[in-house]
């Protein structure tokens, strides 16, 4: 199922990508057209600049020609003045004066013509410069507008390309993830195949074993239980039936599937009635603009109450599903909750019958609407018939479901022989409901297609029609599922009615079912008492591994214990040697002090001139100091604290009290050291106990934090689901924005075509003006 969902999502993403790619191509074409228009306008501007330069050159040439003519006129005037002076002086040359007068008149005429021509050229140049200036200003303003539009379009195209690249990368990543998941699923499929093969082999072995056991048990039953008499059906009705757990599990599974189908049916009916209410508020008269007719107003009020009739269907089916458990017996006589579902279904059918006249009148009102065509009227007639048919089918289903609910409340109200007939009639009615809903969806689709062509059709009406069509498609789908489900399980429903005591006619009332359940509980309790729990065992391979680990650990433990014992013995010996050498050092200190005192006394005696008598012990000490310790005999004294070696000379020494005092001091210091060690050990134990308590507190805190983290993970999962819903909504909004952008691009293309037409008309007008100027 996960791979199917992922493939469906991937296909949706691919479709969205293809749509976005097509829109991107449209945007690119529009941008290319804008760029072409911009280049054409730039070329036109260049041509206008060239024509302006030519006219300026002509103007310069004309001004130069005018200056030349003015100079020539001045020269001619000078010549005329000279000729006049000569004519006054000489009256002889009359003929020449006449000739000069004729030349002067000719020059005057020529000058007048040149002046008129110059004036006409000035006027033409001024008009041409004015028209050119106006054209240049208009074209520059249009060029700026087009450049801004092209920049905007380029920004939109860049943003869309970036978005498409991101979507492509995301799709590629999703594709890689899907490939990895497919590989993992293929591996799991291989493992599952191997497991199924093993399970099939085990099933075969178990089947053979159980079949042999069944044969043996049947032989024993036939031999050992000949007293069971099942000939008289009246007495067999008193038999306690056997509880079939497999039958109950199958019934619960079918009830669960029926509950899911009823939920889908409830959602489809809710959507259909809700969208029908919205359509009545919009067409043929929009409630936001004008007052709706009283018929449609009443019809919309009734449709607004659809949830109170439709949702109880799901509640009744849910109660029926919850009443079917492993510890119950499910037949028509014990299915008490079926009565609730029957009552809810009857109330919904009454609701359909109540709104049917209003729905038919509403269709007639739509047909009488002024903008309705003959085809639309025929579609309304088809819907008129379909609504009557679907209400009749629901009424038929209500009758059969009410009959099925009778055995649980009134067993005498329905004969047991009619159960199978009623179930087959329900199956046929469900198939008929699917066919009628399919025809209704088809006819409504044709009607919606005709209504979209009407001039009075608004966007709100189109979207509402799409919603109604989607709800009808969902209704058709769920009715087909229910019909196929009921048809496939019809044999099971009919065969399950024979579930009852052995040799009997079935359940007559729910008391036998309760008795059977009581005996079942007693039998289960008896078997639990007989069954002794097996001692907990360990698998053989795991036991071998544990034995190896145990042997290795015991060997290592023994070796470590020996090492510890040896190290403890070494430590004891070293401590004894330490004590011995410490006592030796103290005795040597005492001897040194005595020798120093004796030497001091000898020095004093020598100073006085007397040689004191050396005692025997001191002589022996001197001999021992001179000859060494080789001849002296030693005695060893060993205690728990240490070992003490004392020579005979030391024992014979007169200062026993001082030696005992030293030994006492040594032992006291040793006891003090041991007490300090003991106190340190106690403090360490207290510290370890505090650490253990702290660790216990940390463990409790970690448990609390773990619980809080699990709650946070639940909240995070909920937030992830919310974010996924927000992602879906944002995706839909982006799709709407893209559709709006495509519409905007279409409008921009239309405006660009209009601008092209205007530019062409201006070109034609410019050409006509230029021709008129040339004609002038």
From Swiss-Prot:
Keywords for this protein: Coiled coil, Endosome, RNA-binding
Compartments reported by the entry: Early endosome
GO molecular function: RNA binding
Keyword Glycoprotein: no
The protein's assembly and partners: Component of the FERRY complex.
Record remark: domains: Coiled-coil domains of PPP1R21 are essential for RNA binding.
Full protein name: Protein phosphatase 1 regulatory subunit 21
Originating organism: Xenopus laevis
Gene: ppp1r21
């Amino acid at each position: 199922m996960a791979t199917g969902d992922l493939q469906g999502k991937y296909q949706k993403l691919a479709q969205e990508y293809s749509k976005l790619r097509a829109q991107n191509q449209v945007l690119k074409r529009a941008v290319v057209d804008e760029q072409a228009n911009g280049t054409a306008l730039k070329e036109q501007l260049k041509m206008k600049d060239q024509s302006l330069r030519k006219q300026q050159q002509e103007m310069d040439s004309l001004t130069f020609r005018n200056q030349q003519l003015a100079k020539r006129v001045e020269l001619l005037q000078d010549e005329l003045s000279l000729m006049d002076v000569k004519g006054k002086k000489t009256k002889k040359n009359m003929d020449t004066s006449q000739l000069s007068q004729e030349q002067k008149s000719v020059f005057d005429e020529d000058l007048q013509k040149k002046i008129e021509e110059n004036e006409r050229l000035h006027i033409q140049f001024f008009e041409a410069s004015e028209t050119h200036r106006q054209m240049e200003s208009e074209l520059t303003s249009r060029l700026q507008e087009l450049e801004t539009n092209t920049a905007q379009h380029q920004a939109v195209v860049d943003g869309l390309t970036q978005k498409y690249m991101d979507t492509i990368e995301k799709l590629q990543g999703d594709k890689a993830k899907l490939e990895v998941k497919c590989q993992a699923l293929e591996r799991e499929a291989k493992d599952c195949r191997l497991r199924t093969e093993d399970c099939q082999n085990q099933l075969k072995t178990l089947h053979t074993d159980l079949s042999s056991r069944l044969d043996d048990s049947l032989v024993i039953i036939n031999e050992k239980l000949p007293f069971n008499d099942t000939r008289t059906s009246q007495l067999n009705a008193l038999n306690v039936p056997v509880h079939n757990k497999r039958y109950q599990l199958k019934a619960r599974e079918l009830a669960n599937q029926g509950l899911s189908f009823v939920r889908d049916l409830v959602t489809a009916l809710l959507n259909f009635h809700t969208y029908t209410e919205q359509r009545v508020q919009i067409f043929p008269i929009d409630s936001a603009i004008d007052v709706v007719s009283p018929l449609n107003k009443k019809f919309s009020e009734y449709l607004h109450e659809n949830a109170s009739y439709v949702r109880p269907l799901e509640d009744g089916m849910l109660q029926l599903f919850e009443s079917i458990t492993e510890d119950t017996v499910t037949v028509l006589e014990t299915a008490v909750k079926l009565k609730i579902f029957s009552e809810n279904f009857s109330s919904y059918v009454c609701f359909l019958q109540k709104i049917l006249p209003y729905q038919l009148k509403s269709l007639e009102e739509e047909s009488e609407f002024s903008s309705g065509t003959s085809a639309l009227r025929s579609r309304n007639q088809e819907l008129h018939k379909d609504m009557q048919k679907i209400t009749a089918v629901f009424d038929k289903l209500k009758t059969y479901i009410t009959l099925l609910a009778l055995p649980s409340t009134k067993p005498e109200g329905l004969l047991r022989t009619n159960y199978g007939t009623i179930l087959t009639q329900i199956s046929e009615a469900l198939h008929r409901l699917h066919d009628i809903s399919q025809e209704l969806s088809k006819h409504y689709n044709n009607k919606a297609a005709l209504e979209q062509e009407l001039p009075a059709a608004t966007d709100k009406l189109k979207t509402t029609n799409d919603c109604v069509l989607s709800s009808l498609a969902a209704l058709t789908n769920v009715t087909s599922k229910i019909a196929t489900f009921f048809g496939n399980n019809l044999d099971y429903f009919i065969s399950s009615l024979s579930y009852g005591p052995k040799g009997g006619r079935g359940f007559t009332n729910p008391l036998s079912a309760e008795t059977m359940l009581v005996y079942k509980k007693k039998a289960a309790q008896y078997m639990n008492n007989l069954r002794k729990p097996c001692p907990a065992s360990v698998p053989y391979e795991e036991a071998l591994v544990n034995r190896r680990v145990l042997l290795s650990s015991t060997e290592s433990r023994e070796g470590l214990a020996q090492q510890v014992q040896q190290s403890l013995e070494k430590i004891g010996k070293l401590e004894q040697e330490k004590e011995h050498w410490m006592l030796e050092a103290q005795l040597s200190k005492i001897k040194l002090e005595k020798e120093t005192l004796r030497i001091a006394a000898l020095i004093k005696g020598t100073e006085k001139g007397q040689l004191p008598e050396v005692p025997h012990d001191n002589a022996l000490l001197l001999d021992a100091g001179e000859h060494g310790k080789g001849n002296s005999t030693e005695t060893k004294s060993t205690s728990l604290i240490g070992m003490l070696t004392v020579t005979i000379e030391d024992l014979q020494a007169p200062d026993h009290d001082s030696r005992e005092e030293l030994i006492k001091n040594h032992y006291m210091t040793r006891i003090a050291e041991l007490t300090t060690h003991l106190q340190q050990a106690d403090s360490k134990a207290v510290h370890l106990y505090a650490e253990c308590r702290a660790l216990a507190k940390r463990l409790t805190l970690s448990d609390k934090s773990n619980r809080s983290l699990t709650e946070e993970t639940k909240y995070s999962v909920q937030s992830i689901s919310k974010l996924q819903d927000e992602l879906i909504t944002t995706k839909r909004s982006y799709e709407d924005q893209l559709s709006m952008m495509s519409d905007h691009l279409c409008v921009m293309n239309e405006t660009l075509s209009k601008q092209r037409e205007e530019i062409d008309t201006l070109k034609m007008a410019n050409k006509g003006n230029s021709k008129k100027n040339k004609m002038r």
